[in-house]
């Protein structure tokens, strides 16, 4: 099943911060928007893995 999430990016002095609107615990930072987007995808993958291992329900749209 394909899940869709909305990312919100905030410009920081050190680069960008990204956070998923539907799953605010998934958050990351990067020096530029591309790095932030990539890091946010990695954070999402890790969070999904952790939730599955613990038997938690994964939020999705």
Predicted regions and their residues:
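Hydrophobic alpha-helix-in-membranes signature
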Residues: 21-23, 58
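Short, charged, surface-exposed hinge/linker loops at domain edges
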Residues: 1-6, 12, 38-61
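A short, exposed loop/beta-hairpin motif centered on an aromatic-Gly-Thr core
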Residues: 24-35
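Short aromatic-glycine-(Arg/Gly/Cys) micro-motifs in beta-strand/loop hairpins
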Residues: 8-21
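Structural detector for hydrophobic anchor residues on beta-strands
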Residues: 5, 16, 26-28
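Residue-identity detector for glycine
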Residues: 15-18, 30, 55
């Amino acid at each position: 099943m394909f899940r869709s999430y909305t990312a919100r990016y905030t410009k920081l002095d050190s680069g960008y911060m990204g956070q998923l609107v539907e799953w605010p615990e998934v958050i990351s930072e990067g020096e530029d928007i591309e790095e932030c987007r990539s890091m946010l995808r990695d954070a999402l993958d890790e969070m999904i893995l952790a939730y599955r291992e613990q038997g938690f329900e994964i939020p999705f749209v």
